[in-house]
């Protein structure tokens, strides 16, 4: 609870975004990502459809930089008013249409704890990262470019953002090297709605494992001759999420966990 993040288009100020948590007596109290329907509805005095503005909060805490996750937080009495119930349907419908990585609240808490204790240090031509392994995504400012998975350790890939790139780590320890954005020379992860539990990749291919809470979706930076397999069958890519980038291919599986192989014939 707490934090009361309530940024909206009517009040698009960073001062309306609460912290991830607060230290008290040697402990870290983790706040809810955003406030609940009470604030959006003037302490449940109306308008009872006010919680639909949580969508504005989700959008404004994701761009131009990701500050908070999508956390749908409300009391069950929200469904006691038709307008409140309609607002819930609208918020859930919006969330289901987004490319999100679902996690339990307990997993989010672990990520916030890792955020507060993560260590970053310059080491040689890269950056040393040490944490608990709960937090797996780091935002690199534009000046650093993008992670180079093939020249790093503990880095699975990266994705673009409006204010930099996001590096995907495979665990709590990594050495990350960055350079101006370019197509990876070896297979790399662009995004996924699940957690990486295993990653072993070379220029000729390799394998990785994803563990999620729903049907798996993931995108890969892939050289054109590479094939992707799971459950002893070749996976057919879905329509590209970025039509102008032929090296990016998107895949879907009905499983919540899968070990995926990539094979790249010699060129």
Question: Model regions: which residues?
Answer:
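Short, glycine-/Ser/Thr-/acidic-enriched flexible segments
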Residues: 13, 77-79, 134, 215
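Active-site proximal loops enriched in glycine and acidic residues that flank catalytic Cys/His/Asp
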Residues: 3, 8-12, 73-76, 104-107, ...
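C-terminal regions of proteins
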Residues: 20-53, 86, 106-126, 130-143
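Catalytic grooves of carbohydrate-active enzymes
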Residues: 34-110
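Catalytic domains of cell-wall/extracellular-matrix polysaccharide-remodeling enzymes
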Residues: 1-30, 84-85, 258-259, 265
């Amino acid at each position: 609870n707490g934090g009361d993040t309530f940024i909206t288009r009517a009040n698009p100020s960073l001062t309306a975004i609460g912290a991830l948590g607060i230290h008290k007596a040697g402990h870290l109290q983790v706040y809810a990502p955003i406030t609940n329907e009470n604030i959006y509805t003037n302490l449940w005095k109306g308008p009872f459809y006010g919680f639909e503005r949580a969508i504005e909060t989700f959008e404004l805490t994701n761009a131009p930089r990701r500050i908070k996750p999508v956390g749908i937080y409300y009391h069950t009495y929200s469904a006691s008013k038709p307008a409140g119930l309609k607002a819930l349907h609208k918020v859930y419908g919006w969330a289901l249409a987004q490319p999100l990585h679902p996690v339990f609240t307990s997993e989010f808490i672990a990520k916030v704890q890792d955020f507060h204790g993560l260590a970053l240090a310059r080491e040689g031509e890269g950056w040393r990262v040490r944490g608990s392994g709960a937090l797996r995504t780091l935002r690199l400012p534009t000046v650093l470019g993008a992670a180079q998975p093939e020249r790093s350790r503990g880095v699975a890939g990266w994705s673009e953002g409006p204010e930099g790139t996001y590096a995907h780590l495979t665990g709590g320890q990594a050495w990350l090297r960055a350079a101006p954005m370019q197509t990876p020379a070896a297979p790399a992860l662009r995004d996924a709605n699940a957690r990486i539990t295993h990653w072993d990749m070379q220029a000729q291919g390799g394998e990785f494992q994803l563990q999620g809470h729903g049907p798996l979706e993931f995108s890969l930076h892939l050289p054109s001759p590479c094939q992707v397999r799971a459950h002893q069958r070749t996976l057919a890519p879905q329509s590209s999420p970025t039509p102008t980038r032929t090296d990016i291919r998107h895949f879907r599986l009905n499983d919540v966990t899968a070990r995926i192989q990539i094979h790249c014939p010699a060129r």
